[in-house]
Amino acid sequence: MLYQKLELMLTKFKVLPLLQKSFLGIVFIYSIIALYYFLQKSPGGDEMLFIADLELIKKEGWMHAIEKNISIPYMLLVYPLSLLLKNYVALRLVNVLLLILLFVYFAKRKDTFEFSFYGYLLFFISTVGYFFFGINDTLFFLGLIIYLNEVNQLQKNNKWNGTLAIIALLVSFFTRKLIFVYSPILIFSWYIIYKYKGFKSLNIKLLIPILVLFLGLNVPSFLHKGNISYDLKNPPKNIKATWTQRQYLAQLMVNEGSLPDQQHPSWEKTDAYLIANGENSLPENLIDGLFFDINLTVKEFFKELYSCMFYGFRQLGLILFIPLVFLIKDILKTKKLNISMMIPICLLVMICIFSLIIISFMELRWLAPVFILTIVYFSDLQKEKIWNSTIIKANYFVLLFLSFYGIFSLWTKF
Protein backbone atom coordinates (compact mmCIF):
# COMPACT_ATOMS: atom_id res chain seq x y z
CA MET A 1 0.00 0.00 0.00
CA LEU A 2 2.79 2.40 0.98
CA TYR A 3 4.73 1.47 -2.17
CA GLN A 4 1.68 2.22 -4.35
CA LYS A 5 1.18 5.61 -2.68
CA LEU A 6 4.86 6.46 -3.19
CA GLU A 7 4.65 5.44 -6.86
CA LEU A 8 1.49 7.54 -7.33
CA MET A 9 3.12 10.58 -5.71
CA LEU A 10 6.26 10.29 -7.86
CA THR A 11 4.12 9.97 -10.99
CA LYS A 12 1.99 12.97 -10.01
CA PHE A 13 5.01 15.25 -9.67
CA LYS A 14 6.53 13.93 -12.92
CA VAL A 15 9.75 12.89 -11.21
CA LEU A 16 10.91 10.61 -14.04
CA PRO A 17 11.19 13.32 -16.75
CA LEU A 18 12.93 15.61 -14.24
CA LEU A 19 15.42 12.89 -13.27
CA GLN A 20 16.10 12.07 -16.91
CA LYS A 21 16.76 15.70 -17.88
CA SER A 22 18.94 16.24 -14.78
CA PHE A 23 20.96 13.11 -15.53
CA LEU A 24 21.48 14.04 -19.18
CA GLY A 25 22.63 17.54 -18.24
CA ILE A 26 25.04 16.36 -15.55
CA VAL A 27 26.44 13.50 -17.64
CA PHE A 28 27.11 15.90 -20.52
CA ILE A 29 29.21 18.07 -18.18
CA TYR A 30 30.85 14.90 -16.80
CA SER A 31 31.79 13.76 -20.32
CA ILE A 32 33.38 17.11 -21.22
CA ILE A 33 35.49 17.08 -18.05
CA ALA A 34 36.47 13.44 -18.58
CA LEU A 35 37.38 14.06 -22.23
CA TYR A 36 39.65 16.96 -21.29
CA TYR A 37 41.17 15.19 -18.28
CA PHE A 38 42.10 11.95 -20.04
CA LEU A 39 43.30 13.54 -23.28
CA GLN A 40 45.60 16.05 -21.57
CA LYS A 41 47.39 13.39 -19.51
CA SER A 42 50.98 12.57 -20.37
CA PRO A 43 51.41 9.23 -22.17
CA GLY A 44 52.19 6.25 -19.99
CA GLY A 45 51.39 2.62 -19.20
CA ASP A 46 50.36 0.48 -22.16
CA GLU A 47 50.47 3.52 -24.45
CA MET A 48 54.26 3.27 -24.42
CA LEU A 49 54.04 -0.12 -26.14
CA PHE A 50 52.11 1.34 -29.09
CA ILE A 51 54.32 4.42 -29.24
CA ALA A 52 57.29 2.05 -29.48
CA ASP A 53 55.52 0.08 -32.22
CA LEU A 54 55.02 3.25 -34.27
CA GLU A 55 58.69 4.14 -33.88
CA LEU A 56 59.65 0.63 -34.92
CA ILE A 57 57.56 0.88 -38.10
CA LYS A 58 59.13 4.24 -38.97
CA LYS A 59 62.69 3.06 -38.35
CA GLU A 60 62.66 -0.60 -39.45
CA GLY A 61 59.63 -0.79 -41.75
CA TRP A 62 56.36 -2.70 -41.66
CA MET A 63 57.83 -6.13 -42.43
CA HIS A 64 60.19 -6.06 -39.46
CA ALA A 65 57.50 -4.63 -37.16
CA ILE A 66 55.02 -7.37 -38.09
CA GLU A 67 57.70 -10.01 -37.52
CA LYS A 68 58.26 -8.51 -34.08
CA ASN A 69 54.46 -8.58 -33.47
CA ILE A 70 52.23 -5.52 -33.59
CA SER A 71 48.47 -4.93 -33.71
CA ILE A 72 48.19 -4.54 -37.49
CA PRO A 73 44.64 -3.11 -37.83
CA TYR A 74 45.27 -0.51 -35.14
CA MET A 75 48.67 0.49 -36.51
CA LEU A 76 47.20 0.86 -40.01
CA LEU A 77 44.72 3.41 -38.64
CA VAL A 78 47.22 5.30 -36.50
CA TYR A 79 50.32 5.35 -38.72
CA PRO A 80 49.15 7.99 -41.28
CA LEU A 81 48.19 10.40 -38.48
CA SER A 82 51.48 9.75 -36.68
CA LEU A 83 53.29 11.24 -39.68
CA LEU A 84 51.54 14.55 -38.97
CA LEU A 85 51.12 14.46 -35.18
CA LYS A 86 52.99 13.24 -32.14
CA ASN A 87 52.65 9.49 -31.75
CA TYR A 88 50.56 9.57 -28.57
CA VAL A 89 48.29 12.29 -30.01
CA ALA A 90 47.69 10.18 -33.13
CA LEU A 91 46.90 7.13 -31.00
CA ARG A 92 44.37 9.01 -28.89
CA LEU A 93 42.82 10.85 -31.83
CA VAL A 94 42.10 7.56 -33.59
CA ASN A 95 40.34 6.28 -30.48
CA VAL A 96 38.22 9.43 -30.20
CA LEU A 97 37.22 8.96 -33.86
CA LEU A 98 36.39 5.31 -33.15
CA LEU A 99 34.18 6.43 -30.26
CA ILE A 100 32.35 8.81 -32.56
CA LEU A 101 31.93 5.91 -35.00
CA LEU A 102 30.37 3.84 -32.19
CA PHE A 103 27.79 6.57 -31.53
CA VAL A 104 27.08 6.89 -35.26
CA TYR A 105 26.62 3.12 -35.50
CA PHE A 106 24.04 3.08 -32.71
CA ALA A 107 22.29 6.12 -34.17
CA LYS A 108 21.94 4.26 -37.47
CA ARG A 109 21.03 0.89 -35.94
CA LYS A 110 18.54 1.81 -33.23
CA ASP A 111 14.94 2.30 -34.33
CA THR A 112 14.47 5.49 -32.34
CA PHE A 113 16.80 8.12 -30.90
CA GLU A 114 16.82 7.48 -27.15
CA PHE A 115 18.47 10.21 -25.10
CA SER A 116 18.65 7.94 -22.06
CA PHE A 117 20.68 5.31 -23.96
CA TYR A 118 23.31 7.84 -25.07
CA GLY A 119 23.34 9.27 -21.56
CA TYR A 120 24.11 5.83 -20.12
CA LEU A 121 26.78 5.30 -22.77
CA LEU A 122 28.41 8.68 -22.06
CA PHE A 123 28.36 7.96 -18.33
CA PHE A 124 30.12 4.63 -18.82
CA ILE A 125 32.76 6.02 -21.19
CA SER A 126 33.43 9.03 -18.93
CA THR A 127 33.75 6.84 -15.85
CA VAL A 128 36.16 4.24 -17.22
CA GLY A 129 38.35 6.63 -19.23
CA TYR A 130 40.30 3.94 -21.08
CA PHE A 131 38.56 4.62 -24.39
CA PHE A 132 40.65 7.79 -24.58
CA PHE A 133 43.98 6.00 -23.99
CA GLY A 134 46.27 5.41 -26.95
CA ILE A 135 45.89 1.63 -26.94
CA ASN A 136 44.19 -0.85 -29.27
CA ASP A 137 41.39 -1.74 -26.85
CA THR A 138 38.94 0.74 -28.36
CA LEU A 139 39.22 -0.81 -31.85
CA PHE A 140 38.96 -4.31 -30.39
CA PHE A 141 35.91 -3.35 -28.31
CA LEU A 142 34.22 -1.55 -31.21
CA GLY A 143 34.43 -4.63 -33.42
CA LEU A 144 33.03 -6.95 -30.75
CA ILE A 145 30.25 -4.54 -29.78
CA ILE A 146 29.06 -4.19 -33.38
CA TYR A 147 29.26 -7.95 -33.99
CA LEU A 148 27.41 -8.98 -30.82
CA ASN A 149 24.81 -6.24 -31.22
CA GLU A 150 24.07 -7.40 -34.76
CA VAL A 151 23.63 -10.99 -33.54
CA ASN A 152 21.32 -9.69 -30.82
CA GLN A 153 19.28 -7.86 -33.46
CA LEU A 154 19.07 -11.09 -35.44
CA GLN A 155 17.58 -13.10 -32.56
CA LYS A 156 15.36 -10.23 -31.46
CA ASN A 157 13.68 -9.12 -34.68
CA ASN A 158 15.41 -11.18 -37.38
CA LYS A 159 17.06 -8.04 -38.75
CA TRP A 160 20.82 -7.90 -38.93
CA ASN A 161 23.62 -6.62 -41.11
CA GLY A 162 25.49 -9.90 -41.26
CA THR A 163 28.30 -8.71 -43.53
CA LEU A 164 29.03 -5.74 -41.27
CA ALA A 165 28.95 -8.05 -38.24
CA ILE A 166 31.53 -10.47 -39.67
CA ILE A 167 33.80 -7.63 -40.84
CA ALA A 168 33.66 -6.18 -37.31
CA LEU A 169 34.49 -9.60 -35.85
CA LEU A 170 37.45 -10.00 -38.22
CA VAL A 171 38.80 -6.60 -37.16
CA SER A 172 38.59 -7.62 -33.49
CA PHE A 173 40.11 -11.03 -34.21
CA PHE A 174 43.20 -9.54 -35.84
CA THR A 175 43.50 -6.67 -33.32
CA ARG A 176 43.88 -8.40 -29.94
CA LYS A 177 44.64 -11.91 -28.76
CA LEU A 178 42.04 -11.34 -26.04
CA ILE A 179 39.46 -12.44 -28.63
CA PHE A 180 40.18 -16.06 -27.69
CA VAL A 181 38.92 -15.49 -24.14
CA TYR A 182 35.60 -14.50 -25.71
CA SER A 183 35.39 -17.88 -27.50
CA PRO A 184 32.48 -19.27 -25.39
CA ILE A 185 30.10 -16.44 -26.25
CA LEU A 186 31.35 -16.34 -29.85
CA ILE A 187 30.44 -20.02 -30.21
CA PHE A 188 27.06 -19.21 -28.65
CA SER A 189 26.61 -16.38 -31.17
CA TRP A 190 27.44 -18.67 -34.10
CA TYR A 191 24.73 -21.05 -32.89
CA ILE A 192 22.26 -18.15 -32.90
CA ILE A 193 23.30 -17.15 -36.42
CA TYR A 194 22.87 -20.76 -37.56
CA LYS A 195 19.48 -21.13 -35.83
CA TYR A 196 18.12 -17.94 -37.37
CA LYS A 197 19.71 -18.70 -40.77
CA GLY A 198 21.84 -15.56 -40.63
CA PHE A 199 24.70 -17.07 -42.64
CA LYS A 200 22.54 -16.99 -45.78
CA SER A 201 22.57 -13.19 -45.91
CA LEU A 202 26.37 -12.83 -45.84
CA ASN A 203 28.15 -11.21 -48.78
CA ILE A 204 30.82 -13.87 -49.25
CA LYS A 205 32.32 -12.06 -52.27
CA LEU A 206 33.20 -9.16 -49.96
CA LEU A 207 34.14 -11.14 -46.84
CA ILE A 208 36.63 -13.51 -48.47
CA PRO A 209 38.86 -10.73 -49.90
CA ILE A 210 38.84 -8.98 -46.51
CA LEU A 211 39.87 -12.21 -44.77
CA VAL A 212 42.58 -12.82 -47.38
CA LEU A 213 43.83 -9.25 -46.89
CA PHE A 214 44.17 -9.69 -43.13
CA LEU A 215 45.91 -13.05 -43.57
CA GLY A 216 48.22 -11.54 -46.19
CA LEU A 217 49.21 -8.72 -43.86
CA ASN A 218 50.16 -11.35 -41.27
CA VAL A 219 52.43 -13.35 -43.61
CA PRO A 220 55.68 -11.93 -42.11
CA SER A 221 54.51 -13.02 -38.66
CA PHE A 222 53.43 -16.45 -39.95
CA LEU A 223 56.84 -16.99 -41.55
CA HIS A 224 58.85 -15.64 -38.62
CA LYS A 225 56.91 -16.92 -35.60
CA GLY A 226 54.17 -19.11 -37.01
CA ASN A 227 51.29 -17.10 -35.58
CA ILE A 228 49.11 -14.02 -36.04
CA SER A 229 50.75 -10.69 -35.27
CA TYR A 230 49.45 -9.43 -31.92
CA ASP A 231 50.99 -6.74 -29.75
CA LEU A 232 52.98 -8.35 -26.95
CA LYS A 233 54.22 -6.98 -23.65
CA ASN A 234 57.32 -9.12 -23.56
CA PRO A 235 59.47 -9.42 -20.42
CA PRO A 236 62.99 -7.97 -20.59
CA LYS A 237 65.37 -10.14 -22.63
CA ASN A 238 67.31 -11.41 -19.60
CA ILE A 239 64.13 -12.54 -17.78
CA LYS A 240 62.95 -16.17 -17.82
CA ALA A 241 59.64 -15.71 -15.97
CA THR A 242 56.33 -15.47 -17.86
CA TRP A 243 53.49 -13.00 -17.37
CA THR A 244 51.39 -15.75 -15.77
CA GLN A 245 54.15 -16.47 -13.24
CA ARG A 246 54.50 -12.79 -12.41
CA GLN A 247 50.74 -12.37 -11.94
CA TYR A 248 50.45 -15.55 -9.88
CA LEU A 249 53.29 -14.48 -7.60
CA ALA A 250 51.62 -11.09 -7.25
CA GLN A 251 48.48 -12.69 -5.82
CA LEU A 252 50.49 -14.89 -3.46
CA MET A 253 52.33 -11.82 -2.15
CA VAL A 254 49.11 -9.80 -1.85
CA ASN A 255 47.51 -12.61 0.16
CA GLU A 256 50.43 -12.77 2.56
CA GLY A 257 50.51 -8.98 2.91
CA SER A 258 53.95 -8.38 1.37
CA LEU A 259 52.60 -6.53 -1.69
CA PRO A 260 49.84 -3.89 -2.01
CA ASP A 261 46.69 -4.98 -3.84
CA GLN A 262 46.66 -4.45 -7.63
CA GLN A 263 50.46 -4.29 -7.81
CA HIS A 264 53.00 -6.61 -9.44
CA PRO A 265 56.41 -7.73 -8.18
CA SER A 266 59.32 -6.77 -10.41
CA TRP A 267 60.46 -9.17 -13.10
CA GLU A 268 63.72 -9.59 -11.22
CA LYS A 269 61.88 -10.57 -8.03
CA THR A 270 59.80 -13.10 -9.98
CA ASP A 271 62.93 -14.67 -11.45
CA ALA A 272 64.53 -14.72 -8.00
CA TYR A 273 61.46 -16.53 -6.61
CA LEU A 274 61.74 -19.20 -9.32
CA ILE A 275 65.46 -19.66 -8.63
CA ALA A 276 64.88 -19.96 -4.88
CA ASN A 277 61.82 -22.24 -5.05
CA GLY A 278 62.30 -24.13 -8.30
CA GLU A 279 61.05 -23.70 -11.86
CA ASN A 280 57.79 -25.48 -11.02
CA SER A 281 56.98 -23.27 -8.03
CA LEU A 282 54.79 -21.03 -10.23
CA PRO A 283 52.45 -21.99 -13.12
CA GLU A 284 53.92 -21.23 -16.53
CA ASN A 285 50.70 -20.44 -18.41
CA LEU A 286 47.03 -19.64 -17.92
CA ILE A 287 45.75 -23.23 -18.04
CA ASP A 288 48.41 -24.39 -15.57
CA GLY A 289 47.39 -21.55 -13.29
CA LEU A 290 43.79 -22.78 -13.08
CA PHE A 291 44.82 -26.20 -11.75
CA PHE A 292 48.04 -25.27 -9.92
CA ASP A 293 46.23 -24.74 -6.60
CA ILE A 294 42.51 -25.52 -6.85
CA ASN A 295 41.74 -24.03 -3.43
CA LEU A 296 43.40 -20.74 -4.40
CA THR A 297 41.62 -20.74 -7.77
CA VAL A 298 38.19 -21.14 -6.11
CA LYS A 299 38.99 -18.55 -3.45
CA GLU A 300 40.21 -15.99 -5.99
CA PHE A 301 37.24 -16.69 -8.26
CA PHE A 302 34.78 -15.49 -5.63
CA LYS A 303 37.04 -12.56 -4.69
CA GLU A 304 37.23 -11.45 -8.32
CA LEU A 305 33.49 -12.01 -8.78
CA TYR A 306 32.75 -9.72 -5.85
CA SER A 307 35.29 -7.17 -7.08
CA CYS A 308 33.74 -7.22 -10.56
CA MET A 309 30.25 -6.58 -9.18
CA PHE A 310 31.45 -3.87 -6.78
CA TYR A 311 33.49 -1.88 -9.29
CA GLY A 312 31.08 -2.72 -12.10
CA PHE A 313 28.38 -0.95 -10.09
CA ARG A 314 30.59 2.15 -10.13
CA GLN A 315 30.67 1.99 -13.93
CA LEU A 316 27.06 1.03 -14.65
CA GLY A 317 24.94 1.59 -11.56
CA LEU A 318 21.87 -0.66 -11.38
CA ILE A 319 22.22 -1.36 -15.11
CA LEU A 320 24.74 -4.11 -14.25
CA PHE A 321 22.37 -6.07 -12.02
CA ILE A 322 18.95 -5.73 -13.65
CA PRO A 323 19.72 -7.89 -16.74
CA LEU A 324 21.11 -10.59 -14.42
CA VAL A 325 17.92 -10.46 -12.33
CA PHE A 326 15.91 -10.67 -15.54
CA LEU A 327 17.93 -13.75 -16.59
CA ILE A 328 17.35 -15.50 -13.25
CA LYS A 329 13.61 -14.78 -13.41
CA ASP A 330 13.44 -16.16 -16.95
CA ILE A 331 15.33 -19.34 -16.00
CA LEU A 332 13.07 -19.94 -12.99
CA LYS A 333 10.00 -19.40 -15.15
CA THR A 334 10.96 -21.45 -18.23
CA LYS A 335 13.45 -23.91 -16.63
CA LYS A 336 15.91 -23.34 -19.49
CA LEU A 337 18.28 -20.84 -21.09
CA ASN A 338 16.48 -18.90 -23.80
CA ILE A 339 18.24 -17.27 -26.74
CA SER A 340 16.18 -14.14 -26.07
CA MET A 341 18.38 -13.74 -22.99
CA MET A 342 21.52 -13.53 -25.17
CA ILE A 343 22.95 -10.36 -23.64
CA PRO A 344 22.41 -11.31 -19.96
CA ILE A 345 23.88 -14.75 -20.72
CA CYS A 346 26.95 -13.21 -22.40
CA LEU A 347 27.37 -10.81 -19.47
CA LEU A 348 27.23 -13.57 -16.86
CA VAL A 349 29.49 -15.94 -18.82
CA MET A 350 32.23 -13.35 -19.39
CA ILE A 351 32.15 -12.13 -15.78
CA CYS A 352 32.59 -15.73 -14.62
CA ILE A 353 35.33 -16.49 -17.17
CA PHE A 354 37.47 -13.49 -16.24
CA SER A 355 36.88 -14.09 -12.53
CA LEU A 356 38.08 -17.67 -12.99
CA ILE A 357 41.14 -17.26 -15.21
CA ILE A 358 42.58 -14.14 -13.57
CA ILE A 359 44.26 -15.19 -10.35
CA SER A 360 45.61 -11.70 -9.68
CA PHE A 361 43.48 -8.55 -10.03
CA MET A 362 41.06 -8.31 -12.96
CA GLU A 363 40.95 -5.27 -15.22
CA LEU A 364 37.29 -4.47 -15.82
CA ARG A 365 38.10 -2.94 -19.21
CA TRP A 366 38.25 -6.49 -20.58
CA LEU A 367 34.49 -6.62 -20.02
CA ALA A 368 33.72 -3.39 -21.90
CA PRO A 369 31.98 -5.08 -24.88
CA VAL A 370 29.48 -6.96 -22.71
CA PHE A 371 29.06 -3.96 -20.39
CA ILE A 372 28.06 -1.74 -23.32
CA LEU A 373 25.71 -4.42 -24.62
CA THR A 374 24.20 -4.51 -21.14
CA ILE A 375 23.44 -0.80 -21.57
CA VAL A 376 21.75 -1.66 -24.88
CA TYR A 377 19.69 -4.36 -23.17
CA PHE A 378 18.68 -2.14 -20.25
CA SER A 379 17.68 0.76 -22.49
CA ASP A 380 15.53 -1.61 -24.58
CA LEU A 381 13.77 -2.76 -21.40
CA GLN A 382 13.24 0.87 -20.45
CA LYS A 383 11.85 1.75 -23.90
CA GLU A 384 9.52 -1.26 -23.86
CA LYS A 385 8.41 -0.35 -20.30
CA ILE A 386 8.97 -3.92 -19.11
CA TRP A 387 10.34 -2.69 -15.79
CA ASN A 388 8.40 -0.69 -13.22
CA SER A 389 9.25 3.00 -13.54
CA THR A 390 10.46 3.00 -9.92
CA ILE A 391 13.46 0.91 -11.02
CA ILE A 392 14.25 3.46 -13.73
CA LYS A 393 13.97 6.32 -11.24
CA ALA A 394 16.20 4.52 -8.74
CA ASN A 395 18.80 4.00 -11.45
CA TYR A 396 18.72 7.68 -12.39
CA PHE A 397 19.25 8.60 -8.73
CA VAL A 398 22.23 6.23 -8.53
CA LEU A 399 23.79 7.47 -11.78
CA LEU A 400 23.28 11.11 -10.78
CA PHE A 401 25.12 10.47 -7.52
CA LEU A 402 27.91 8.58 -9.32
CA SER A 403 28.18 11.35 -11.93
CA PHE A 404 28.64 14.00 -9.24
CA TYR A 405 31.19 11.73 -7.56
CA GLY A 406 33.02 11.24 -10.88
CA ILE A 407 33.08 14.98 -11.60
CA PHE A 408 34.44 15.69 -8.12
CA SER A 409 37.09 12.95 -8.42
CA LEU A 410 38.34 14.24 -11.77
CA TRP A 411 38.21 17.88 -10.69
CA THR A 412 40.48 17.23 -7.71
CA LYS A 413 43.08 15.65 -10.02
CA PHE A 414 43.60 18.73 -12.21
Predicted feature descriptions by range:
Residues I70, F132-F140, E363-L364:
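Short acidic/glycine- and proline-prone juxtamembrane loop motifs at membrane-interface regions
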Residues V89-A90, N95, E284-F354, I358:
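Membrane-interface anchor segments at the N-terminal boundary of transmembrane helices
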Residues L49-E55, M63-K86, V96-L97:
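Short hydrophobic/aromatic helix or loop-helix immediately within or flanking a transmembrane segment
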Residues L93-E114, I146, V325, K329-D330:
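Transmembrane-helix motifs of polytopic, lipid-linked glycan transferases
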Residues S42-G45, L49-D53, F180-I187, N203-A272:
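Juxtamembrane membrane-water interface segments immediately following transmembrane helices
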Residues Y3-L8, K12, E150-Q153, Y182-F214, ...:
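Perimembrane helix-loop-helix junctions
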Residues N161-K177, F188, I210-F214:
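Membrane-interface alpha helices of multi-pass inner-membrane proteins
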Residues F103-V128, L142, I343-P344:
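Transmembrane-helix signature of polytopic, membrane-embedded enzymes
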